[in-house]
Regions:
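Catalytic histidine-centered segment of alpha/beta-hydrolase-like enzymes
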Residues: 293-304
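Alpha/beta-hydrolase-fold enzymes
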Residues: 134-219
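Conserved alpha/beta-hydrolase
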Residues: 67-87
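Short beta-strand element of the alpha/beta-hydrolase
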Residues: 43-52
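Alpha/beta-hydrolase active-site loop
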Residues: 93-114
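The serine-hydrolase catalytic nucleophile loop
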Residues: 54-66, 80
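Short beta-strand/loop motif that positions the catalytic acidic residue
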Residues: 255, 261-263
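N-terminal cap/lid segment of alpha/beta-hydrolase-fold proteins
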Residues: 2-42
């Protein structure tokens, strides 16, 4: 793992930072950054952070982890399996099952740290990892509080497209194309990618606002990172069918612990968070809509991300 500071955000003087790794139950080694309040003593409440989907720990998840450490938590940001500095072959693949396990493995790791109070662990998922975080929390009662920030329901988008405008015939055609690709790539190895974000100088201005906003983050100095899937060639195309036959939060009634969903008022993805929130049960579920914020504003805009409210949520439920 790279030891020098190579994040897209500035290092805080209020926290200590170290690189660590931990394994999931599939035997994959995950790379992580630990952020801890300076001069902290005793066992702390801890939070594991991942996302956005297609990003690495040097991007938004690291920023969130560092901001939470500034507010008194031990926080880790990790690279999912098959991406960044984590292990797994082939590279730049995803799996709802394995990625849900990645969050649970982070809880395994935190639960065994001597400076963490094992019954005071929460998680944060950003973008597509917001949905995966809820999936993990529904499966794992050790996760006492979950934040899904600017969340995507990736299986919903994968199966029906943005704003549910896709059709079953379109989905079947995509499956046929990927099935043919699988036959070909069985002998050649995985080669074809879905494509990352569009370079800024190739944008025409006619793209949807959210497409331009993704490029403004992933393809500029603001958020570009050399190990980020979205900043470069994108995911392996074969993986895409994984979203078409799965769902997140199959049993929302099992998610008994606290949940906070955070979305931007102007986020194209807002409907996913609001619809998911409607499925949740109990008075320990909260929804925050950030005035004027877009989807990617909640990646890194410190004046838009409600870190103090997120910290207050964790302080309340990680007692």
């Amino acid at each position: 793992m790279t030891q020098e500071w190579d994040k897209v955000f500035a290092k805080s003087e209020k926290v200590e930072h170290e690189k660590v790794s931990f394994h999931n139950h599939f035997g994959l080694e995950l790379a992580a950054d630990v952020y801890k309040p300076k001069h902290a003593q005793g066992r702390l409440a801890a939070v594991a952070v991942c996302g956005p989907f297609g990003a690495v720990k040097e991007q938004s998840s690291g920023l969130y982890a560092q901001a939470l450490a500034e507010r008194g938590f031990l926080a880790i940001a990790f690279d999912p399996s098959f991406t960044g500095e984590s292990s797994g072959q082939p590279r730049d693949m995803f799996s709802l099952d394995i990625n849900t396990e990645d969050f649970q493995a982070a809880v395994d790791y935190l639960s065994n740290r001597p400076d963490v109070e094992a019954n005071r662990i929460g998680i944060v998922g950003i973008c597509g990892w917001g949905g995966i975080a809820l999936n993990a929390a529904a499966a794992d009662p050790r996760i006492k509080a979950t934040v899904a920030s600017t969340m995507y329901d990736m299986p919903r988008v994968g199966a029906w497209g943005y704003f549910d405008q896709g059709t079953a015939d379109e989905r079947y055609k995509a499956k046929e194309q990927i099935a043919a690709l699988r036959t070909k790539e069985y002998t050649t190895g995985l080669k074809q990618r879905a494509g990352g974000c569009i370079p800024v100088d190739q944008l025409t201005g006619k793209e949807p606002d959210f497409v331009q906003q993704y490029s403004a983050y992933y393809k500029t100095k603001r958020g570009y990172h050399q190990r980020s899937v979205n900043s470069n060639g994108g995911w392996m195309l074969q993986a895409q069918t994984g979203w078409m036959n799965n769902n997140i939060l199959a049993h929302p009634e099992d998610l008994r612990n606290a949940v906070l969903i955070v979305h931007g008022e102007k986020a194209h993805s807002r409907y996913m968070g609001e619809d998911t929130f409607k499925k949740l049960k109990g008075d320990n579920k909260q929804l925050i809509i950030v005035d004027g914020a877009t989807h990617t504003d909640l990646y890194d805009q410190m004046d838009k991300i409600p870190f103090d409210r997120i910290a207050a949520f964790f302080n309340k439920y990680l007692k």
